[in-house]
Amino acid sequence: MTTGRMSRRECLSAAVMVPIAAMTATATITGSAQAAKNNMNGSTIGKITKFSPRLDAILDVSTPIEVIASDIQWSEGPVWVKNGNFLLFSDPPANIMRKWTPDAGVSIFLKPSGHAEPIPAGQFREPGSNGMKVGPDGKIWVADSGTRAIMKVDPVTRQRSVVVDNYKGKRFNSPNDLFFSKSGAVYFTDPPYGLTNLDESDIKEMNYNGVFRLSPDGRLDLIEAGLSRPNGLALSPDETKLYVSNSDRASPNIWVYSLDSNGLPTSRTLLRNFRKEYFDQGLAGLPDGMNIDKQGNLFASAPGGIYIFAPDGECLGLISGNPGQPLSNCCFGEKGQTLFISASHNVVRVRTKTFG
């Protein structure tokens, strides 16, 4: 593991107070449970590989990886909505948010899920919603590539409202993923992946791709501006560590930030570099979304699938899709022992021994 110490100047920029906006937007709702169901649902893909005996307490290698949804352009951002017993997941390029229930299968929850249609020509490669979490208010908080904002969605009325869409007057690039602290602060990443031409986009206003922390009182801190492609993120259960992936071919890394009592980073450590897996082994995917269980085990997507890291950093195992199939993100759901994974054109689930 490689350690690099950051100064306060490198860790933090000046904070800015951001009021919670009152804007709302509506979206077309389709309640039919027909879309995205085909004969692949119920089949299995991939495999589970054990690197350490410690994996046995978390996951059985014989557990099937079951397909629950298919025919998706690019699945992302799964979130389990406990108050309703359903899964939501994004399809960013299709501008759709879908819903899955054990009984009814898959239906369209929001369309458009991000930018209002028609989409401006030449501006967006991913106009829809991306990462999602259930907030302390019971709303679905969304890292929305299309509106270039952190949004929230009422799970009953499906009304959308803007939480924050700028830092110091400059529009976000295309928020990608988010994670809540116990206090209700939300950490989120802002790479350029939603924009056509990425960093060269004509509508990009920031000259960096940031990681931010929004406090419950509306204070917004830029906590990292030095990553080329910040993407997935997760907090350790004791909230002393923030994991952040960098989804860049040149530096495919997962970083661990040590946090102070205010939830702000003081240093960062390299958990793992995936150049070998990506370049030498040719495994599909890059460091992307992640989640964490109640014991602090990290489930992180990277070249080859979902890697499972113990709190001490040891890599315990790997959940893989079919060859050439990247896995982009994951969440725990149902009774806490099901890991839902967005897997390219599919969404799959894996039963776990651990609770998330």
From Swiss-Prot:
InterPro entries (alphabetical): 6-blade_b-propeller_TolB-like, SGL, SMP-30, SMP-30/CGR1_Lactonase, TAT_signal
Subcellular location: Periplasm
Enzyme class: hydrolase
N-terminal signal peptide: 1-35
GO biological process, one term: D-gluconate biosynthetic process
Catalytic reactions of this protein: D-glucono-1,5-lactone + H2O = D-gluconate + H(+)
Keyword Transmembrane helix: no
Keyword terms: Hydrolase, Periplasm, Serine esterase, Signal
Record-level Gene Ontology MF annotations: gluconolactonase activity
Functional pathway: Carbohydrate acid metabolism; D-gluconate biosynthesis; D-gluconate from D-glucono-1,5-lactone: step 1/1
Enzyme Commission number, as recorded: 3.1.1.17
One GO cellular component term: periplasmic space
Modification(s) after translation: Predicted to be exported by the Tat system. The position of the signal peptide cleavage has been experimentally proven.
General function of this protein: Hydrolyzes the gluconolactone formed by glucose-fructose oxidoreductase, and that formed in aerobic conditions by the glucose dehydrogenase present.
Subunit and partners: Homodimer.
Protein name: Gluconolactonase
Lineage of origin: Bacteria, Pseudomonadati, Pseudomonadota, Alphaproteobacteria, Sphingomonadales
